[in-house]
Amino acid sequence: MNKKNIITILLALVAILSVSIILKGQGNETKSAEAKPKYATEQKKTQDDAVLTYDISSLQDSASLIILVIREYDQQGMVDEMKGQRLKMAKTLSIGFSPRQSVQSDSIVTVYVRPDSRNGLARDLVLKPVPDAPETFYLYEKVPIQVSALRPNTFIPLAFYGSFWWDSNYKTCRFCGEKELTEENIKESDYFKYSPHYYIIGAIFSDNTARVIPL
């Protein structure tokens, strides 16, 4: 075998080895991309609102106290109810969350409830990872609840704070539904059908004498 043929063979082997390395690297990149889930949400307007504010001035003559109520649910139903201390009645009630949007690695979020501009209440909410997701993610979002009529001595739901759910068909964490819930559609929403874990944040506007009527 002459020198020219040897050089040709060596160059061919180098070319084959280079192609093999490139293809292997591309295969690893594809595998890594497939393992990382995507997130689907149709809550653009809601996500931009840092604080939810409600006008409760119509109850000032019939209620004197605000009682914070947080109800925790899973797909089996309500698992816990937390009642906060009583606050003096106000014209407005604001609900905010910290961090503003749940961070993937955070397992706790704080909800703040503030009457008018006064100091209010803060409660920590324990989050749960998205079931069936390939990695551990804590992904939650808030949705305001539009109240058709404010009633004293009755639990009034004001905000839904729920977990994303895993869509195995599209390999994504999903949170899609209405930008605002109402008391009429609250139980028919996809959030309630598919969210594996959620909280309903609300209040009882009490006259301090009557029996509280459950939702």
Named regions from a protein language model:
Residues 207-209:
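Short A/G/S/P-biased low-complexity tracts
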Residues 60-142:
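Structured domain cores in non-transmembrane regions
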Residues 1-32:
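Bacterial Sec-dependent N-terminal signal peptides
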